[in-house]
Amino acid sequence: MLTLRTKTTSPLSFLRLDAGLFAGNSINRETDSRKDFIGRLGAEKAIGDWGKWGAGFSYYHGFVYNPTTEAYEMRGNHFVKRDMGETGTYMKRQYLGLDGQFSFLSSLGKTTLRAEGLIGTQPGIAGRSKSPNYSTRPENLPENSLFKRPFLGYFFYLVQDIGASPFSAVLKYDVYDPNTKVSGNEVGAENSFTSKTDLAQSTIGIGGI
Protein backbone atom coordinates (compact mmCIF):
# COMPACT_ATOMS: atom_id res chain seq x y z
CA MET A 1 0.00 0.00 0.00
CA LEU A 2 1.15 3.55 -0.77
CA THR A 3 0.57 6.43 1.66
CA LEU A 4 1.21 10.06 0.71
CA ARG A 5 1.29 13.00 3.12
CA THR A 6 2.95 16.39 3.02
CA LYS A 7 5.29 17.73 5.70
CA THR A 8 3.66 18.85 8.94
CA THR A 9 4.63 22.44 8.11
CA SER A 10 2.65 22.36 4.84
CA PRO A 11 -0.80 23.99 4.67
CA LEU A 12 -1.99 20.68 3.15
CA SER A 13 -0.69 18.53 6.00
CA PHE A 14 -4.25 17.67 6.99
CA LEU A 15 -4.64 15.59 3.80
CA ARG A 16 -3.69 11.93 3.43
CA LEU A 17 -3.86 9.62 0.41
CA ASP A 18 -3.83 5.83 0.80
CA ALA A 19 -3.95 3.51 -2.20
CA GLY A 20 -3.01 -0.03 -3.04
CA LEU A 21 -3.51 -3.16 -5.10
CA PHE A 22 -4.62 -6.20 -3.13
CA ALA A 23 -5.00 -9.90 -3.87
CA GLY A 24 -7.76 -11.78 -2.05
CA ASN A 25 -9.45 -10.75 1.19
CA SER A 26 -7.12 -12.36 3.79
CA ILE A 27 -9.95 -14.72 4.78
CA ASN A 28 -9.67 -17.50 2.23
CA ARG A 29 -6.72 -18.28 0.00
CA GLU A 30 -6.51 -16.48 -3.34
CA THR A 31 -7.84 -18.42 -6.33
CA ASP A 32 -6.66 -16.14 -9.17
CA SER A 33 -4.01 -13.54 -10.00
CA ARG A 34 -6.34 -10.55 -10.28
CA LYS A 35 -5.79 -7.53 -8.07
CA ASP A 36 -8.35 -5.19 -6.50
CA PHE A 37 -7.70 -1.46 -6.15
CA ILE A 38 -8.58 0.38 -2.94
CA GLY A 39 -7.95 4.09 -2.42
CA ARG A 40 -8.96 6.80 0.02
CA LEU A 41 -8.33 10.53 0.17
CA GLY A 42 -8.91 11.76 3.70
CA ALA A 43 -8.72 15.01 5.62
CA GLU A 44 -8.56 15.61 9.36
CA LYS A 45 -8.02 18.80 11.29
CA ALA A 46 -8.35 20.05 14.85
CA ILE A 47 -10.52 23.05 15.73
CA GLY A 48 -8.70 24.83 18.51
CA ASP A 49 -8.52 22.68 21.62
CA TRP A 50 -12.20 21.80 21.69
CA GLY A 51 -13.02 19.98 18.46
CA LYS A 52 -11.93 18.02 15.40
CA TRP A 53 -13.38 17.30 11.98
CA GLY A 54 -12.60 14.70 9.35
CA ALA A 55 -13.84 13.69 5.91
CA GLY A 56 -12.90 11.25 3.20
CA PHE A 57 -13.62 9.89 -0.25
CA SER A 58 -12.93 6.24 -1.01
CA TYR A 59 -12.96 4.10 -4.14
CA TYR A 60 -12.84 0.37 -4.67
CA HIS A 61 -12.56 -1.48 -7.97
CA GLY A 62 -12.37 -5.24 -8.25
CA PHE A 63 -13.88 -8.35 -9.76
CA VAL A 64 -15.85 -11.38 -8.60
CA TYR A 65 -15.34 -14.81 -10.13
CA ASN A 66 -18.38 -16.37 -11.83
CA PRO A 67 -18.17 -20.18 -11.80
CA THR A 68 -21.15 -20.71 -14.11
CA THR A 69 -22.00 -20.07 -17.75
CA GLU A 70 -24.86 -17.75 -16.74
CA ALA A 71 -25.09 -14.40 -14.96
CA TYR A 72 -27.88 -11.94 -14.19
CA GLU A 73 -27.95 -8.16 -14.57
CA MET A 74 -30.70 -5.63 -13.89
CA ARG A 75 -32.68 -4.18 -16.79
CA GLY A 76 -35.32 -1.82 -15.50
CA ASN A 77 -36.98 -3.51 -12.52
CA HIS A 78 -36.06 -7.11 -13.33
CA PHE A 79 -33.04 -9.32 -13.81
CA VAL A 80 -32.06 -10.49 -17.29
CA LYS A 81 -30.15 -13.72 -17.76
CA ARG A 82 -26.92 -13.48 -19.74
CA ASP A 83 -25.18 -16.36 -21.44
CA MET A 84 -21.50 -15.93 -20.57
CA GLY A 85 -20.45 -18.64 -23.02
CA GLU A 86 -18.02 -20.25 -20.60
CA THR A 87 -17.24 -20.67 -16.92
CA GLY A 88 -14.58 -18.58 -15.22
CA THR A 89 -15.67 -15.10 -16.31
CA TYR A 90 -15.68 -12.11 -13.94
CA MET A 91 -18.16 -9.45 -12.90
CA LYS A 92 -17.08 -5.97 -11.89
CA ARG A 93 -17.46 -4.93 -8.25
CA GLN A 94 -17.21 -1.20 -7.61
CA TYR A 95 -17.78 1.04 -4.58
CA LEU A 96 -17.77 4.81 -4.10
CA GLY A 97 -17.77 6.05 -0.54
CA LEU A 98 -18.03 9.29 1.42
CA ASP A 99 -17.45 9.63 5.15
CA GLY A 100 -17.31 12.45 7.64
CA GLN A 101 -17.08 13.02 11.35
CA PHE A 102 -17.14 15.88 13.82
CA SER A 103 -16.32 15.77 17.51
CA PHE A 104 -16.29 18.42 20.20
CA LEU A 105 -15.90 18.80 23.95
CA SER A 106 -18.52 20.23 26.28
CA SER A 107 -19.57 20.00 29.92
CA LEU A 108 -21.34 16.74 29.04
CA GLY A 109 -18.13 15.18 27.76
CA LYS A 110 -16.97 14.41 24.23
CA THR A 111 -19.63 14.26 21.50
CA THR A 112 -18.89 12.50 18.21
CA LEU A 113 -21.04 12.59 15.09
CA ARG A 114 -20.11 10.26 12.24
CA ALA A 115 -21.70 9.43 8.88
CA GLU A 116 -20.70 7.20 6.00
CA GLY A 117 -22.29 6.29 2.68
CA LEU A 118 -21.53 3.77 -0.06
CA ILE A 119 -22.94 3.28 -3.56
CA GLY A 120 -21.85 0.92 -6.28
CA THR A 121 -22.34 -2.46 -7.88
CA GLN A 122 -22.16 -5.70 -5.93
CA PRO A 123 -22.21 -9.14 -7.58
CA GLY A 124 -23.89 -11.66 -5.28
CA ILE A 125 -25.98 -14.77 -5.78
CA ALA A 126 -29.75 -15.30 -5.87
CA GLY A 127 -30.11 -15.81 -2.14
CA ARG A 128 -27.44 -13.45 -0.87
CA SER A 129 -26.41 -9.94 -1.89
CA LYS A 130 -22.93 -10.26 -0.40
CA SER A 131 -20.27 -11.36 -2.87
CA PRO A 132 -19.32 -15.05 -2.54
CA ASN A 133 -16.19 -15.77 -0.53
CA TYR A 134 -14.83 -18.87 -2.21
CA SER A 135 -11.89 -20.85 -0.79
CA THR A 136 -12.06 -23.23 -3.77
CA ARG A 137 -13.58 -22.90 -7.23
CA PRO A 138 -17.29 -23.88 -6.97
CA GLU A 139 -19.15 -26.06 -9.43
CA ASN A 140 -21.04 -24.90 -12.51
CA LEU A 141 -24.46 -25.02 -10.84
CA PRO A 142 -27.41 -22.58 -11.20
CA GLU A 143 -27.32 -21.62 -7.51
CA ASN A 144 -23.77 -20.34 -7.97
CA SER A 145 -24.65 -17.89 -10.78
CA LEU A 146 -23.82 -14.26 -10.05
CA PHE A 147 -26.47 -11.52 -9.73
CA LYS A 148 -25.13 -8.01 -10.29
CA ARG A 149 -26.98 -5.50 -8.09
CA PRO A 150 -26.68 -1.70 -7.80
CA PHE A 151 -26.67 -0.95 -4.06
CA LEU A 152 -26.81 1.93 -1.61
CA GLY A 153 -25.90 1.94 2.05
CA TYR A 154 -25.33 4.59 4.71
CA PHE A 155 -25.24 5.05 8.46
CA PHE A 156 -25.18 7.77 11.12
CA TYR A 157 -23.57 7.50 14.55
CA LEU A 158 -23.92 9.68 17.63
CA VAL A 159 -21.58 8.83 20.49
CA GLN A 160 -21.89 10.83 23.70
CA ASP A 161 -19.36 10.39 26.49
CA ILE A 162 -20.93 10.55 29.94
CA GLY A 163 -18.89 13.21 31.67
CA ALA A 164 -15.51 11.97 32.89
CA SER A 165 -16.76 8.39 33.27
CA PRO A 166 -15.45 5.58 31.03
CA PHE A 167 -18.97 5.07 29.60
CA SER A 168 -20.62 6.42 26.45
CA ALA A 169 -24.15 6.40 25.05
CA VAL A 170 -24.53 5.40 21.39
CA LEU A 171 -27.29 6.09 18.86
CA LYS A 172 -27.04 4.54 15.38
CA TYR A 173 -29.22 4.60 12.29
CA ASP A 174 -28.31 2.60 9.19
CA VAL A 175 -29.89 1.81 5.83
CA TYR A 176 -28.93 -0.85 3.29
CA ASP A 177 -30.64 -1.24 -0.06
CA PRO A 178 -29.05 -4.20 -1.90
CA ASN A 179 -30.89 -3.42 -5.14
CA THR A 180 -31.83 0.19 -5.84
CA LYS A 181 -33.65 -0.74 -9.05
CA VAL A 182 -36.61 -2.38 -7.26
CA SER A 183 -38.79 -1.60 -4.26
CA GLY A 184 -42.09 -2.54 -2.67
CA ASN A 185 -44.26 -4.92 -4.68
CA GLU A 186 -41.72 -5.04 -7.50
CA VAL A 187 -39.61 -7.36 -5.36
CA GLY A 188 -40.57 -10.97 -6.05
CA ALA A 189 -42.68 -10.13 -9.11
CA GLU A 190 -43.22 -12.96 -11.57
CA ASN A 191 -40.31 -13.57 -13.97
CA SER A 192 -38.28 -10.77 -12.37
CA PHE A 193 -35.79 -13.17 -10.72
CA THR A 194 -35.90 -10.87 -7.66
CA SER A 195 -36.49 -12.12 -4.13
CA LYS A 196 -36.32 -11.08 -0.48
CA THR A 197 -32.57 -10.72 -1.02
CA ASP A 198 -33.37 -7.50 -2.92
CA LEU A 199 -35.38 -5.89 -0.11
CA ALA A 200 -34.10 -2.69 1.51
CA GLN A 201 -33.73 -2.59 5.27
CA SER A 202 -33.07 -0.01 7.96
CA THR A 203 -32.33 -0.24 11.68
CA ILE A 204 -32.10 2.06 14.68
CA GLY A 205 -29.91 1.09 17.58
CA ILE A 206 -29.44 2.54 21.06
CA GLY A 207 -26.81 1.28 23.44
CA GLY A 208 -23.77 1.98 25.53
CA ILE A 209 -20.08 1.21 25.59
Q: What are these regions, as identified by a protein language model?
A:
Residues 51-61, 66-209:
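Outer-membrane beta-barrel pore domains
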